[in-house]
Swiss-Prot record:
Disulfide bonds: none annotated. GO terms for cellular component: cytosol. This is DNA mismatch repair protein MutS. GO terms for molecular function: ATP binding; ATP-dependent DNA damage sensor activity; damaged DNA binding; mismatched DNA binding. The lineage of its organism: Bacteria, Bacillati, Bacillota, Bacilli, Lactobacillales. The keyword rRNA-binding does not apply.
Amino acid sequence: MAVEKLSPGMQQYLDIKKDYPDAFLLFRMGDFYELFYDDAVNAAQILEISLTSRNKNAENPIPMAGVPYHSAQQYIDVLVESGYKVAIAEQMEDPKEAKGVVKREVVQVITPGTVVDSSKPDSANNFLVALDYSDGLYGLAYMDLVTGEFQVTSLEDFALVCGEIRNLKAREVVLGYALPEAEEQVLAGQMNLLLSYVQTALDDVQLLGEELSPMERQAAGKLLEYVHRTQMRELSHLKKAQHYEIKDFLQMDYATKASLDLTENARSGKKHGSLYWLMDETKTAMGGRMLRSWIQRPLIDEARISQRQNVVEVFLDHFFERSDLTESLKGVYDIERLASRVSFGKTNPKELLQLAATLGNVPQIKAILQGIGSPHLARLIEGLDPIPELAGLISSAISPDAPHIITEGNIIQTGFDETLDQYRLVLREGTGWIAELEVKERANSGISNLKIDYNKKDGYYFHVTNSQLAHVPSHFFRKATLKNSERFGTEELARIEGEMLEAREKSANLEYEIFMRIREEAGKYIQRLQALAQTLAAVDVLQSFAAVAEQQHLVRPVFTAERRLQIEKGRHAVVEKVMGAQSYIPNSILLDQETDIQLITGPNMSGKSTYMRQLAIIVIMAQMGSYVPAQSASLPLFDAIFTRIGAADDLVSGQSTFMVEMMEANRAIRQASERSLILFDELGRGTATYDGMALAQAIIEHIHHYTGAKTLFATHYHELTALEESLEHLENVHVATLEKDGQVTFLHKIEPGPADKSYGIHVAKIAGLPEKLLERADSILSHLESQDTGLGSELPTASRPKQSQVAEQMSLFAEGTENPVLTELRDLDIYNMTPLEVMAAVAELKKKL
């Protein structure tokens, strides 16, 4: 259809739509939001709503779909959850007063990273990330638009950037145009992120300060620009950007956090079965968010850790006070989110009452902590600001029975505003006047069933049935005729109605004005509310630590400056909670100054992986400031944890199990220090036996000679146990088994020395393989053992000269005159390249063959 034939309303739609080509445009028309053209077609499919058309009789009808205004939020949620943007175009004037087309403007763009209203409120953070890049350095900024949290850092490695984005569970990333195309493809393709672009950076001195580097300032500025561009309002709740360094926390990449089930179970994707699930005895949404953050970022500063431990100890020593505290915390609402709604101008009366109720609980919480009388609680007590001015204003102004909707009246309490009270008096007296008038006219007219009714169309009226029409007084005038009755008015009734309607309208308008003033006044306290929220969250998390310590029988760990780690009867607290304390077998571990590496052998399913994860979880809990699951625990402060636990291909990136193993091993070898913890489980199983064994041994030797990190290395290569003879800082341990009458029992107990068998056939039996197959396997095993075809003699040890292998793997890099293509291939640093970069490089080399 030609543009000139469009109606003014459709032309207005197209004019607005061209400014938001990447968003669904919800175009307000009366009581509906309408969508047109491709937006309508696509939205109808996603939202499962009817697709109709505008101008159905035209040659090219315009596709149209719509959703009701009052229930639009649930449809917006579906679109945003599906990864789309939604632009909201509102009517900016009353259609009854409009001259021509009703003026409409986009008032907000809702995106996956900027959701502030939702029909399904969630206590989790929703982070929006911005990136900037120059000369090998990345600036990364992130923000939660609801809580106002705003953090900025610099990173030198794109892998770290991806890991940080994954840790934040971000769904949208804001970019300039400087990021390499291959890296953009990784973000959009492999990580399935929505990419949004801005060219300019907002330089807000108040929010950005002077401490940020130029790259960080660019990233943070682009984030602010995008947020202001989409939200189109003042965002007074945003906190000042805080610089952080990942090296200031216990470093763990995304794969490590996933393999350790820190915030969700890797298999189910649910909270159940994670460390977060175990540790979460918080009573507030703010506490839940802070707990998740502490789990993701354990500390490396012993003083800060001790501060948290001291508070936990105080709470453990004061059971009754802690019980009172938890009860008080149950009455605390999510004031971070409430403060953001104040800032957005979206707070309703019920939410202001929730704010006042929370502030009303603060003095009681403060009194409980003061009553304990511990100096370790001083900082928390100081941060408990009850903001009495705001609490008093809301409590005196807002009616306890106030509705959610701010235009329906009955919001403001009687006695708060004298003028409003006068209007309400007129309404109350008017009701009495109408009742008196009804009695008077019934007596004067002799109509026994005469009564006064009301509806929106006719207002107040006398209701007279047809049988009584002959008795209608002469001063009655007809207002409406029905089948069995008629409706009449009088001058006196009209006067009373006029006074009441005027009072009702003025009362509603005045209530709205008063409420808006109160909401504006509340906006002045946003920073104090946010500071209070942080203190309440910390109190909540620390009481949660105490509750878990009590329930799970945890102990306070001790940190030592020596490189000595000793845990007596340690437990994997999550596994223990799932299994039950009676079923779990604790294990001790000692890695002193003379022992850096434990080489763990034993059958599959015997508990090697649990033993390794147990140590990592204890370290993480300790450096969070929590107590730990052990009889006693003494350990050094670690700067990083590196893991390779569990075998799974990275199908999204097109990387095999072995490639993933090698890349994770490479990260550990390159980045670990002697203050790190390395956990490698069955490294090398993804390739040929000799290759895997050779690589496993070389990696162990490298860690032993050059890294010095505390390391647990589980392996099925029993030949590697000979390394204990040549590597002075390595010791063998194994998982004990009990073999009796042909039956094998896994004891799940770690004992010194190497394992003598792998019991693979027994594991296969447990898995339910056919009996004939198992008998054949046992026969083959007996034959191999009688031939003594062990592989140990084929592997060089650190002190033994290398011997030629009988079955040598073909080399890609043969000696002699070398093809220049092979030279280029060898020089590729594939472990620091993305899969797409590797593919592109190989494609270029292929052209040269």
